[in-house]
Amino acid sequence: MEPIKVISIVGSPRPNSRTAAGDAAVRQALMARGAACRVWNLGRQPLPLLDPDADEDVDCPAARLVVAVRQADAVVLASPIYHNSFSGHLKVALDHLGMDDVGGRAVGLVSHGGARSTQAVDQLRIVVRSLHGVAVNTQLCTDEADFGDGPRLIDPAAVDRAGRLADELLAFAAMLRDHRAAVALTAL
């Protein structure tokens, strides 16, 4: 069977961010379990604001992100906590995605900051639901104390949680991939 394909969308504009390091820990756990992973780091690959009246350029970064998400079985959304919410960078990316892109896909949530606050991931759950994605229950919320040099996730409980998130994401992604395939066959 083909490996589960996962795309991570990292919403931190900072190079070497702890948000990206938390996402990297989840991706490492996913790859150790056989998933094929790629990352779209919005700090290095920024997207323009959505202009719903603009002609769609199929080679623009936003169109490439849409294609990457559609090709994935699962998505990880990772964000720093900004003003008790997720980052504007991630919001811009989500504005470019629709129900046809995220719908029927498992979504894992990662955030960093605010004493492991869940505010960003709580709000992302609502956005994922509106896009008809399925946010898995286990999430990874980190703070400064969870990281060592690099930065690298080192807190044993946080590393364990990244592994549990990976397990859950892969289980849901496999079920949802099978469901999407069955629905596509009945549509023929």
Residue ranges and their predicted role:
Residues 10, 41, 111, 139-141:
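Residue-level recognition of beta-strand->loop/alpha-helix junctions
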